[in-house]
Curated annotation (Swiss-Prot):
Keywords: Acetylation, Chromosome, DNA-binding, Isopeptide bond, Nucleosome core, Nucleus, Ubl conjugation. Residues 1-28, 36-53 have a biased composition (Basic and acidic residues). This is Histone H2B.10. The modification N6-acetyllysine is found at K7, K37. It comes from Oryza sativa subsp. indica. The nucleosome is a histone octamer containing two molecules each of H2A, H2B, H3 and H4 assembled in one H3-H4 heterotetramer and two H2A-H2B heterodimers. The octamer wraps approximately 147 bp of DNA. Pfam families: Histone. One of its GO terms (molecular function) is protein heterodimerization activity. InterPro entries: Histone-fold, Histone_H2A/H2B/H3, Histone_H2B, HISTONE_H2B_site. There is a cross-link at K149 (Glycyl lysine isopeptide (Lys-Gly) (interchain with G-Cter in ubiquitin)).
Amino acid sequence: MAPKAEKKPAAKKPAEEEPAAEKAEKAPAGKKPKAEKRLPAGKAEKSSGEGKKAGRKKAKKSVETYKIYIFKVLKQVHPDIGISSKAMSIMNSFINDIFEKLAGESAKLARYNKKPTITSREIQTSVRLVLPGELAKHAVSEGTKAVTKFTSA
């Protein structure tokens, strides 16, 4: 194998050329000097832009949560009560868990019936299978009400 070429240190940027002592001298007598901009350790090493186009920022991964909806329901039911961030996180995990169970059960039902599409009928049946007793009845009635409101609008 051929020996790898030595890496050259990255050229100094204009902001880094002046030492901090010189910047302090330029500052007015009563004020503190402005802090220098520094790159995080991981970004300073990757300044050459290997593998990615230079200048392009990495897009933030959007994280979808039910937090705002949980808060709205809480305020409808108990307007005077708040919720801690840990309790909110637990509620969000709970809703995600129920959603995954319902989606999995609906997918199974669609496969059993050799249907390529999950319809409201599969969702309703999966709600009856996953949720216990009275909770399933209330969920089905609220779901039916929501679907009729959606189709009529």
